[in-house]
Amino acid sequence: MSELTKRLITGAVLIAVVALVAWIDNFFLTWAFFGVIYLFAFYEALGLFDMKDQNSLYFWAAALWIVAAFYPNPDDLFFIALMIFAGYEAYTQDRNFKKFLPFLYPTASFLFLLSLYHDFGMEALIWLVIVVALTDIGAYFNGKAFGKHPFCKTSPKKTWEGVIGGVLIATIVGSYYALMLVDLPYAIVISFLTSVAAVFGDLFESYLKRRAGVKDSGNILPGHGGVLDRVDGYLFAAPAMVVLLRGLL
């Protein structure tokens, strides 16, 4: 089976699963779906941070996600976890602050992702998916067609033309969809800034992979690499959208 065939089959399965979860639109199903993705992403992040021997962190990651199902503001839990970790470090004088990295990335972002659904509903999640997906797709095709100027050294294949084209397409389509949720000025601002955040979410994961000396964050998704390779844009875009919706509406 060719790499392209694997990529297409995996992509089709992922789209079908996401569509089913969106159609059912049940909080605990969505929480469980995000939870599975989160734990795989957490595992991959440990690899990128060179911490695969820290098995005890999985327990705390799972415990935090279980609490998030019942706590009214899931993103608050990141700050509570930070205080607990700081207290533990002070008490034990362990001084291994690296242990907190996977709770900063990707944990905090997944808590914001759950908060987006909890506070603003499935419509907002679909808005997020539209913006992030079109930012990525638009950047790819515009970069192929018009790309001449490299965006940055962290991701050599990205071009300014591709990034700008992707952000513009995501902003236009995202704003049109968002009219069912917010007024046009808010739709434009939120779509634009969320798209920009997605660009840097992708860039940050590329930076982590470059530092770790790996091409992909994992290999669980045939033809696509790891979970983080698929959700990197969402990990910056979700917090951005939550903050913007809370601040502007």
What are these regions, as identified by a protein language model?
Residues 134-144, 198-210:
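Short helical (or helix-break) motifs at transmembrane helix termini and adjacent helical loops
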Residues 196-200, 230-235:
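Hydrophobic transmembrane alpha-helical segments of multi-pass transport and channel proteins
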Residues 15, 170-171, 230, 237-238, ...:
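Hydrophobic transmembrane alpha-helices of multi-pass small-molecule transporters
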Residues 243-249:
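Juxtamembrane boundary at the C-terminal end of a transmembrane helix
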Residues 44, 202, 229:
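Residue-level signature of catalytic and energy-coupling elements of molecular machines
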Residues 144-145, 209-212, 235, 240:
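Re-entrant/interfacial helical elements at transmembrane boundaries that shape
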Residues 211-234:
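Interfacial loop-to-transmembrane junctions
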Residues 1-159, 163-193:
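Membrane-embedded alpha-helical bundles of polytopic integral membrane proteins
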